[in-house]
Amino acid sequence: MNNNTTAPTYTLRGLQLIGWRDMQHALDYLFADGQLKQGTLVAINAEKMLTIEDNAEVRELINAAEFKYADGISVVRSVRKKYPQAQVSRVAGADLWEELMARAGKEGTPVFLVGGKPEVLAQTETKLRNQWNVNIVGSQDGYFKPEQRQALFERIHASGAQIVTVAMGSPKQEIFMRDCRLVHPDALYMGVGGTYDVFTGHVKRAPKIWQTLGLEWLYRLLSQPSRIKRQLRLLRYLRWHYTGNL
């Protein structure tokens, strides 16, 4: 029988990733023995791997995060290629966030939300409360001034939040989480990018069949042709993968 409260780690280009078999494994790992882990969750996909390679500051930020997991199918395939016996699957960050919120609602875990447009954040709060009775102890949209950051950190600390999710895009959200943890270390932090927009229906996610086939990137490209430059950049990652430079 597999022990869901532990997980192996795998290394890709110097970055250590947690190998979760599936979503249930991820949740059992994060809530091991009924105790929510503390630290920072960072989703890793091919685009982020490239950014890490090119930006030393981002690499340092992400290396410092305790829980780095494979959010992109390309990263999962690379892990499986380098480690043929690895039982690792993609855990999409948006799905993990929803499952965490559902679990938090069930257990009464205090949650603080950061980021997003004011109206999107308000809709996110309402939906979380209505859908899972999430105990939201505070929130802040993404439109605050740099000089307001410290006061926000103090608000988060005073709220007693055990889960803090930050939707500011990378690397802003990783910088925010690193700095906030200096004031409020006893929590699980999660960078969630555009998840609030997807959750509230402002952004349409790829249909399940596209996700299952590992073609979510193609769906996004067809929906937003302006992404072509970003997608072409990923050819570099494919070269790493197919030449075994992992």
From Swiss-Prot:
InterPro entries: UDP-ManNAcA_Trfase_WecG (IPR023085), WecG_TagA_CpsF (IPR004629). Its EC number is 2.4.1.180. It holds the Pfam family Glyco_tran_WecG. The keyword Glycosyltransferase applies. GO terms for molecular function: lipopolysaccharide N-acetylmannosaminouronosyltransferase activity. It catalyses: UDP-N-acetyl-alpha-D-mannosaminouronate + N-acetyl-alpha-D-glucosaminyl-di-trans,octa-cis-undecaprenyl diphosphate = beta-D-ManNAcA-(1->4)-alpha-D-GlcNAc-di-trans,octa-cis-undecaprenyl diphosphate + UDP + H(+). Pathway: Bacterial outer membrane biogenesis; enterobacterial common antigen biosynthesis. Coiled coil: none annotated. It comes from the Bacteria. Catalyzes the synthesis of Und-PP-GlcNAc-ManNAcA (Lipid II), the second lipid-linked intermediate involved in enterobacterial common antigen (ECA) synthesis. This is UDP-N-acetyl-D-mannosaminuronic acid transferase. It comes from Escherichia coli O7:K1 (strain IAI39 / ExPEC). The gene is wecG.
